Structures are given as structure tokens and as C-alpha cells.
């Protein structure tokens, strides 16, 4: 939509092909229905949140970055707010408010929208765009075409990768598609018992064999198949890469990252002195969420009704060790249909970063999730979609045909 809006600012004849009966179905789901539009951090910090290809977006961000996006919506009477970690949301907390602004901009610019229309192929003449063949057999002549069809996630919204398939048929290389911002499955079954339990301000130490490869603090949520939550999602891309190399990956959850092992042992010793007549189960409720206690003791091989005064030194040491390193072995990432974004896509080597035009086909442009860039949660991916869409739309409208 942003590509069509910007292109129609600069040229008269813009057509938007929409597979669904209304636009923006995927946008409505973003930010859990609240639409995390962007992030208010500086450019270098923003680019650092991408998984390795963020520098490709520097030209697009210089043209249309977070402040320009914020102005775009505020100039159209949508108030925005900045929340923790500099995440930007509409004041309404509703993604349909964002969609409404975009729809009005399309209407104002007289963009012609074909609803319930799917594309079948792009036709070329001497490596130059000639037009678009639709699924009903009709043909739309076009000098410029912008492909912004998204990835493979949330396929029920109509995002099923047609644009990538067409790009590949036209000779573009696709970096293998894989899930990003995705929950992780574990070999152990106890997360199912803890389903829904959120642990905040814990440290996750991901390990490859005996080597610690990531160590970050954040929030984790147990699920019926393993673990999820903001921290898990943001690290899942790296985990997926290691798993694809057949590496053995496990995570140690540090439930008390503010305390060293020695400090924690001293704290536990004090708790035991104060609660000698209580059961270990009741005593640990001062240190752990109630829902976690039984599972924790089962893993430590300690009877929950055992009196604190009966706890042996070796058992106390097991408790401390487990508080600092509750282990889960990662079996795999959830499949693409459970991911928030698609990693991979059209190779950046075949896209001009200054225009978003294909280096292989004149008049063909790319934008959004279908190109090989991806980032953490926090508004980074949506800003990349808006920025590449804006740049592609502007470039398509003003770039000469080069005949």
C-alpha cells in the first residue's frame, strides 16, 4: 500500500492488485492487533537489529525512516505514542486505525484497486516489464511493476509466496525461506505442564555443545510444545541457523540473573534457616512462581513435602544449580505457519538498494518481506516494509524507462 501511495503522489496511473476482498489483512495482525508501526531509535541502532543484511536498507531508511513514517500518520490525524523499548503504536491501540489511514490515502490519490484478484505471471519483452497476467486470464499493460506480496507466514491472510515464485521464474535467486521470530520446540515435556507461565527478567544462555553462544535477559513464556516470548522470538533466527547445521542446541534458564551462584546459595541458606519447619515446596514459593515449584522439584529429584530441615547439602546445591541453569534441549523451530516473519527471499545481490529495482529486469521492483531482510520484534520489520515500499513506489514513478 505504501508503494502505491507514494507512486500515485508522483504519477497518474497506479493500479493495486489485491488478492483479498479488502487490503491489509496481515497488517491488522501486527503487534497483536495493536500495530507496532516502527521503533524510535536512531538509524545505526535500528540497522543493528537486523540479522545481517540491515545495511542494505540504509538507502531506503535515508529516504523514509521512522520520523517520516510518524509524520505520515500524524499529518493524517492518527495520533501515535512511544512505549517501552521505543516501540511506536497508534494511540487507539488498534491496527485498523492504521489501515484506515492507508486506505484513505489510496482513495485520495485515486489508486485503482482490483480486489479479489490474483496475479499469475509477469510478462517481459527483452528483459523489460511488459505487463501483468492475472489469474482470470486478463492482462494489464504496465511499464513498472512493484512486487510486495510478502512471505509465507499467516497464509490464511492470502500471503502464500506467489511473488517469490514469480521472481524465481523470472531468473531471480531465492535465499532459502525459513521461519523467523518463531517459538522453539523442546525435547523435554515439562513446558506443557507450565503452559502459559511467563518468566520475566530471566537470562537465557543458549549453548552449542559446551560453548555458550548467546546470553541475554528478557521474558520467556512456556507453551505446550516448548518456549516462546519476546526474547525467544528475537533469538530464534540464530537458533534456526545452528539447528540447520545439525548442531546440538540447548538453553539454560537463569532464574535469578541478578545473583551470583554464591549469593544465591547464601540467600537460600537464609531462607532455609527461617523456614526449617516448612516443606521445601512452600519455602521455594518465595523464590519461584507457584506454578513452577512442583516441576522444579521434580527435576531436582526432591520430594515436595520434605521438610526444609531435612534437605541435605547436596540437594541444596542441586536447587542452586537448577535456579541458575534450568536446562531445555531445543529440538527444532516451529514451522513457517507458526512464525511471525519469513526469513530469506529475493537475493539482495539482485536488487538495487538505491531504487529497489531488479538488477535483472528493467521496470521490476521489490518491497517488504519478500526480500532477504529480517529483524527483531519491536517495529523494525514493519518499518522496513514501509521504507522499501516508499522507495520502490517513488523510484518506479520517477525512474526513466531507459528505452
What are these regions (language model features)?
Residues 151-170, 373-401:
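A conserved FAD-binding loop/helix module that cradles the flavin
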Residues 28-60:
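N-terminal glycine-rich dinucleotide-binding loop that anchors FAD/FMN and/or NAD(P) in oxidoreductases
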Residues 114-116, 121, 294-374:
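A glycine-rich dinucleotide-binding beta-alpha-beta segment and adjacent secondary-structure elements
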Residues 21-29, 37, 43-44, 173-178, ...:
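An anion/pyrophosphate-binding glycine-rich loop and adjacent beta-alpha core
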Residues 1-16, 386-398:
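N-terminal Rossmann-like FAD-binding beta1-loop-alpha1 element of flavoenzymes
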Residues 8-32:
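Glycine-rich FAD pyrophosphate-binding loop
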Residues 59-144, 293, 297:
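Feature captures the FAD/FMN-dependent oxidoreductase FAD-binding
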Amino acid at each position: 500500500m505504501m508503494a502505491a501511495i507514494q507512486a500515485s503522489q508522483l504519477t497518474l496511473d497506479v493500479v493495486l492488485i489485491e488478492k483479498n476482498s479488502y487490503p491489509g489483512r496481515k497488517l491488522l495482525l501486527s503487534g497483536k492487533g495493536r500495530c507496532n508501526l516502527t521503533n524510535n531509535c536512531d538509524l545505526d541502532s535500528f540497522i543493528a537489529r537486523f540479522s545481517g543484511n540491515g545495511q542494505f536498507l540504509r538507502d531506503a531508511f535515508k529516504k523514509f525512516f521512522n520520523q517520516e513514517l510518524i509524520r505520515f500518520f500524524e499529518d493524517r490525524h492518527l495520533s501515535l505514542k512511544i512505549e517501552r523499548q521505543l516501540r511506536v503504536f497508534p494511540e487507539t491501540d488498534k491496527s485498523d486505525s492504521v489501515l484506515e489511514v492507508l486506505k484513505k490515502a489510496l482513495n485520495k490519490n485515486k489508486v485503482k484497486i482490483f480486489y479479489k484478484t490474483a496475479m499469475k505471471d509477469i510478462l517481459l519483452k527483452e528483459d523489460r516489464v511488459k505487463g501483468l497476467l492475472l489469474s482470470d486470464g486478463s492482462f494489464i499493460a504496465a511499464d513498472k511493476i512493484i512486487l510486495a506480496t510478502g512471505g509465507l507466514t499467516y497464509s490464511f491472510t492470502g500471503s502464500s509466496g506467489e511473488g517469490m515464485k514469480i521472481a524465481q521464474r523470472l531468473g531471480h535467486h531465492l535465499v532459502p525461506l525459513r521461519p523467523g521470530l518463531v517459538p522453539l520446540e523442546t525435547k523435554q515435556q515439562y513446558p506443557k505442564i507450565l503452559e502459559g507461565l511467563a518468566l520475566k527478567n530471566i537470562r537465557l544462555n543458549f549453548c552449542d555443545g559446551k560453548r555458550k553462544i548467546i546470553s541475554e535477559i528478557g521474558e520467556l513464556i512456556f507453551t505446550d510444545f516448548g518456549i516462546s516470548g519476546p526474547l525467544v522470538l528475537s533469538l530464534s533466527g540464530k537458533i534456526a541457523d545452528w539447528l540447520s547445521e545439525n548442531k546440538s542446541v540447548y538453553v539454560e534458564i537463569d532464574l535469578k540473573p541478578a545473583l551470583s551462584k554464591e549469593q544465591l546459595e547464601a540467600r537460600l541458606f537464609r531462607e532455609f534457616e527461617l523456614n526449617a519447619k516448612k516443606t521445601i515446596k512452600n519455602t521455594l514459593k518465595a523464590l519461584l512462581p507457584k506454578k513452577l515449584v512442583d516441576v522444579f522439584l521434580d527435576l531436582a529429584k526432591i520430594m515436595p513435602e520434605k521438610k526444609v530441615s531435612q534437605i541435605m547439602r547436596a540437594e541444596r546445591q542441586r536447587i542452586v544449580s537448577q535456579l541458575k541453569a534450568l536446562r531445555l534441549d531445543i529440538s527444532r523451530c516451529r514451522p513457517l505457519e507458526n512464525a511471525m516473519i519469513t526469513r530469506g527471499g529475493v537475493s539482495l545481490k539482485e536488487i538495487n538498494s538505491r531504487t529497489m529495482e531488479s538488477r535483472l529486469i528493467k521496470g521490476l521492483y521489490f518491497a517488504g518481506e519478500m526480500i532477504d531482510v529480517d529483524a527483531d520484534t519491536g517495529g523494525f520489520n514493519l518499518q522496513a516494509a514501509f521504507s522499501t515500499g516508499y522507495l520502490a513506489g517513488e523510484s518506479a514513478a520517477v525512474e526513466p524507462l531507459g528505452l
